[in-house]
Amino acid sequence: MDHVKLVNDPIDIAHIHQLLADAGCGASSVFVGTTRDNFQGKKVVSLAYEAYDSMALKEMNKICLDLRSKWPDLKHIVIYHRLGTVPVCEASVVIAASSPHRSEALESVSFAIDQLKTRVPIWKKEIYEGDHVSEWKENKESIRPKRSKSAFNYAACPCKVEESHDVPRTLVQIRVNDAELTKRLECFVNRKRDEINSQNVIDFKSSFVNSDIDLSDSCARTQSTIIKQEQSNCHLKVRRVNNRCGPQQMEMRPNYELELNKLMGSRDGQTDPFKEMRKSLPNSRLQAIESYMCLTTDNEENIFSRIKKVENRLLQLESISPEYRHFTKLEPSSMELPPPKKIRKKSYSVPELSAFIQKIKEGSEFA
């Protein structure tokens, strides 16, 4: 019988002998690995063991199968390994086997301990006395690679870096000093914090419309309430998001080239852009931009104020989305049915109903 186990308590050697006992066996071999008190001249206090439990037990059972295939006469096999902290002189691993003859027992135990060190994923850390640094390490006999074979060896390829403070201006994206950059970051964080606070007030704070409580000093933290949403396990309102620029909307996106040609004053349908340009050559480019930005055009208005309106429109579009208007403006799909119109039913009074019934009766008599 095979006895395989990872234990956190001290291993009882007497219990191991009981597991090996069998009337038909004339020999039992037991290997006990203990914690020694020194390593490379450093004082060892204890050993700490960790393992990948499921994989370790699987490999230990495979070792038992290998032992029985090589030595079929083996009766009982025991493989116990400690996990956690193991003080000095305590057993950390016990491997034992019983068989009718001593040669099978001795050879199988020697083979098992070598396979355990090689195949089972168990790591240990030596805890030293004093300020010596401890680290986790695997058995040196392990067949698992310590590092990827395809990893690049940076130590074999030294790289010399020449320090230079003259950086080309084309490679610099942010051309401000540290104080200005810190100020911008603080403003961004504060604005995001204000948005979150305002949303928390909307989602959590009740209005207390009919209450006489003074709310001048109240806040969302002290006045918050949780309102159960219908057909939902969440107390926050769930809103459907219309993803207008996702991958599923590729077919509904407009023709970018056509939109850009409109912006540049190219030919569009039956209109002649050169004819329009000859009519008002100084304002043609600005008029095209204003038309594309959906701004009202007034030729008598000052050109600087018109340019200012265009700049404000661009800033507005950039604040809404990094993409511009012609990237997100979608044409209505012909496959989609128009939303049903809400029809409000008319309420009839009693005299109106009586008059309507009377008309029906008169019509039937006439027929």
Curated annotation (Swiss-Prot):
GO terms for cellular component: ATAC complex; cytosol; molybdopterin synthase complex; polytene chromosome. GO terms for molecular function: molybdopterin synthase activity. It is found in: Cytoplasm. It is an enzyme of class 2 (transferase). Its EC number is 2.8.1.12. InterPro entries: MoaE_sf, MOCS2B_euk, Mopterin_biosynth_MoaE. Coiled coil: none annotated. Substrate binds at H101, R102, K117, K124, K125, E126. GO terms for biological process: chromatin remodeling; Mo-molybdopterin cofactor biosynthetic process. It catalyses: 2 [molybdopterin-synthase sulfur-carrier protein]-C-terminal-Gly-aminoethanethioate + cyclic pyranopterin phosphate + H2O = molybdopterin + 2 [molybdopterin-synthase sulfur-carrier protein]-C-terminal Gly-Gly + 2 H(+). The keyword Nucleotide-binding does not apply. Transmembrane segments: none annotated. Keywords: Cytoplasm, Molybdenum cofactor biosynthesis, Transferase. Pathway: Cofactor biosynthesis; molybdopterin biosynthesis. Belongs to the MoaE family. MOCS2B subfamily. Catalytic subunit of the molybdopterin synthase complex, a complex that catalyzes the conversion of precursor Z into molybdopterin. Acts by mediating the incorporation of 2 sulfur atoms from thiocarboxylated Mocs2A into precursor Z to generate a dithiolene group. This protein is produced by a bicistronic gene which also produces the small subunit (Mocs2A). Heterotetramer; composed of 2 small (Mocs2A) and 2 large (Mocs2B) subunits. This is Molybdopterin synthase catalytic subunit. It comes from Drosophila erecta. The lineage of its organism: Eukaryota, Metazoa, Ecdysozoa, Arthropoda, Hexapoda. The gene is Mocs2B.
